[in-house]
Swiss-Prot record:
Keyword Isomerase: no
Quaternary assembly: Interacts with POC1A. Interacts with FAM161A. Interacts with CEP44; the interaction is direct and recruits POC1B to centriolar microtubules. Forms a microtubule-associated complex with POC5, CETN2 and FAM161A. Interacts with CCDC15.
Tissues where this protein is expressed: Expressed in the retina.
Annotated keywords: Cell projection, Cilium biogenesis/degradation, Coiled coil, Cytoplasm, Cytoskeleton, Phosphoprotein, Repeat, WD repeat
Organism this protein belongs to: Mus musculus
Protein's name according to its UniProt entry: POC1 centriolar protein homolog B
UniProt similarity note: Belongs to the WD repeat POC1 family.
PTM info: Phosphorylated in mitotic cells that may be mediated by CDK1.
Cellular location(s): Cytoplasm, Cytoskeleton, Microtubule organizing center, Centrosome, Centriole; Cytoplasm, Cytoskeleton, Cilium basal body; Cytoplasm, Cytoskeleton, Spindle pole
Database matches in Pfam families: WD40
Repeat as UniProt keyword: yes
Length: 476
C-alpha cells in the first residue's frame, strides 16, 4: 500500500459563507480561491497564512457560477438574478453588470485566450460575448430545456453544453452550428467539460454516473457508477490523467482515467458537495458544498504525472479509431499493485487548518451607471454594442500583446484609486456621455430605417395609383 505522503490530505478549510457553496475556482497563479454561494455573495480567499478574506456584494440572488479570466485580472460571475458580472478584484468593489438572458444564468466560462465569454441560461440559450470588442456575438439555440453548463474547448474552436433535455451538444464556434449530439434516456448532465487536450468530454450526471465521451468518434469511452447520488461537478487534472468529482452523496471521488477505476474517496463535507476544482498546477484541489465550507486538499501525486505528456503518448498515427492513449498520457501510477479504494476522512485526524474563519472584509459593488428596465434590452441583438454594460474602460481586459498588466496576487497589491491615470468622476461622465450618444445613434438609425420604409411604401402607392389610372383610361 502506498505511504500516507502519496495520498491526498486536507490542508485547509475556510468558513465565511452563510449558505451552500455553488462554485469555486483557483486564480491562475494559484494564490487565491474565489467562491460563489447561495447567500448571493462571492468571496475571495488568500492561501497565505492569516490573510483576510473579501466578500463581494452585488448580486441579488443565488450566485451559480464563477471563473477567473486567464490573465487573472477579472472574475466573471453568473446568478439567478439573470445577470452576469465582471469584477475587478480590489477593495473598491468595481464591477460591471449586464443582462444577457431572460432567465437565471447557470454558468460562465472564459476562452483560453480570455477574449471570449460563454454564458448558459435557463432560457434554453447559450450566448457568446467578445471581451475585446465589447460586443455580443451570437446565440446558440438547439436545447429544449434549461441549459445547465457551457464550456469552451482548450483551443476555443468548440463549445460543449449540457441541458435538462438530457442532451449534450458540441458546437462549432466558426459556423455556429451543432456538430455533435449525445443523448441519454436515464438522466441529464449537471456539468460538462473538455479534457485538457480537447479530444474528449466528461459529464457529471443526475443519474449518479460520470461518463467520458470521445467527440471525434461520437463514442462513449468510459462509464463510472461510483456515487450513490447525483454528480454535481467534475474537474480534470491539468495533465488529464485523473478526474475528480463532487456529488450529493457528500463525497469527493478521484478517478484514475488510465486504469479506469476509482482510487480515492475524500470525506470532509457534511451534506451534498456542489463544486470541485483542481488548481492550475494540479497540486491542490478545492471543494465546496451545502455545509458552506471551502476545503483545500493537497493532492500529493503531482510528481507522479510530471513527465512530458507528449513523450508518454504511445500512438503516433491518429487516422485509426481513437484509443485512450490518444487522450490521456500514460504515466507511472502509485497504485498499480493495489485495486482497493482509499477513503480519506480528515475528521479522524488532528490537523492544523490555519484559521478556518479568517477576518472578512465586505466589499460593496460599485457601479458608475445605474440601469433600469427602460435603459436596456434584456436580450441584445447580434452585433449590439454592449459598452454600456461595462463599468468603465478600466474594467475591460487588456488584449494587446504590448500591454502588460499586473496580476492581482493579493487584493492588497492592487494600486489605489489615486494612482489611476483617469479620475473616476471623469470616467463616469465620459461613459454617461457615450451612453447617450449611443442611444442617439441607435434612434437616428431607427428613424432612417422607418423613413426608408415609408418612402418605399409611398412609391408603391404611387405606382399602383398610376396603374389604376391607366386601366381606367383604357376601359373608357
Amino acid at each position: 500500500m502506498a505511504s500516507g505522503l502519496e495520498d491526498p490530505i486536507l490542508e485547509r478549510s475556510f468558513k465565511g459563507h452563510k449558505a451552500a457553496i455553488t462554485s469555486a475556482d483557483f486564480s491562475p497563479n494559484c494564490k487565491q480561491i474565489a467562491t460563489a454561494s447561495w447567500d448571493t455573495f462571492l468571496m475571495l480567499w488568500s492561501l497565505k497564512p492569516h490573510a483576510r478574506a473579501y466578500r463581494y456584494v452585488g448580486h441579488k440572488d443565488v450566485v451559480t457560477s464563477l471563473q477567473f479570466s486567464p490573465q487573472g485580472n477579472l472574475l466573471a460571475s453568473a446568478s439567478r438574478d439573470r445577470t452576469v458580472r465582471l469584477w475587478v478584484l480590489d477593495r473598491k468593489g468595481k464591477s460591471s453588470e449586464f443582462k444577457a438572458h431572460t432567465a437565471p444564468v447557470r454558468s460562465v466560462d472564459f476562452s483560453a485566450d480570455g477574449q471570449l465569454l460563454v454564458t448558459a441560461s435557463e432560457d434554453k440559450s447559450i450566448k457568446v460575448w467578445s471581451m475585446f470588442r465589447q460586443r455580443f456575438l451570437y446565440s446558440l439555440y438547439r436545447h429544449t430545456h434549461w441549459v445547465r453548463c457551457a464550456k469552451f474547448s482548450p483551443d476555443g474552436r468548440l463549445i460543449v453544453s449540457c441541458s435538462e433535455d438530457k442532451t449534450i451538444k458540441i458546437w462549432d464556434t466558426t459556423n455556429k452550428q451543432c456538430v455533435n449530439n449525445f443523448s441519454d434516456s436515464v438522466g441529464f448532465a449537471n456539468f460538462v467539460d473538455f479534457n485538457p487536450n480537447g479530444t474528449c468530454i466528461a459529464s457529471a450526471g443526475s443519474d449518479h454516473a460520470v461518463k467520458i465521451w470521445d467527440i471525434r468518434m461520437n463514442k462513449l469511452l468510459q462509464h463510472y457508477q461510483v456515487h450513490s447520488c447525483g454528480v454535481n461537478c467534475l474537474s480534470f487534472h491539468p495533465l488529464g490523467n485523473s478526474l475528480v468529482t463532487a456529488s450529493s452523496d457528500g463525497t469527493v471521488k478521484m478517478l484514475d482515467l488510465i486504469e479506469g477505476r476509482l482510487i480515492y474517496t475524500l470525506q470532509g463535507h457534511t451534506g451534498p458537495v456542489f463544486t470541485v476544482s483542481f488548481s492550475k498546477d494540479g497540486e491542490l484541489l478545492t471543494s465546496g458544498g451545502a455545509d458552506a465550507q471551502v476545503l483545500i486538499w493537497r493532492t500529493n501525486f503531482i510528481h507522479l504525472h510530471c513527465k512530458d505528456p507528449k513523450r508518454n503518448l504511445k500512438r503516433l498515427h491518429f487516422e485509426a479509431s481513437p484509443h485512450l492513449l490518444d487522450i490521456y498520457p500514460r504515466s507511472p501510477h502509485s497504485h498499480e499493485d493495489r485495486k482497493e479504494t482509499i477513503e480519506i476522512n480528515p475528521k479522524r485526524e488532528v490537523m492544523d487548518l490555519q484559521s478556518s474563519s479568517p477576518p472578512v472584509v465586505d466589499v460593496l459593488s460599485f457601479d458608475s451607471t445605474t440601469m433600469t428596465d427602460s435603459t436596456y434590452r434584456a436580450v441584445p441583438g447580434k452585433g449590439e454594442d454592449i459598452c454600456r454594460y461595462f463599468l468603465n474602460p478600466l474594467l475591460m481586459p487588456e488584449c494587446s500583446s504590448t500591454t502588460v498588466k499586473k496580476r492581482p496576487e493579493d487584493v492588497s497589491d492592487v494600486p489605489s484609486e489615486s494612482l489611476r491615470s483617469v479620475p473616476l468622476a471623469v470616467a463616469d461622465a465620459l461613459e454617461h456621455i457615450m451612453e447617450q450618444l449611443n442611444i442617439l445613434t441607435q434612434t437616428v438609425s431607427i428613424l432612417e430605417q422607418r423613413l426608408s420604409l415609408t418612402e418605399d411604401k409611398l412609391r408603391d402607392c404611387l405606382e399602383n395609383q398610376q396603374k389604376l389610372f391607366s386601366a381606367v383610361q383604357q376601359k373608357s
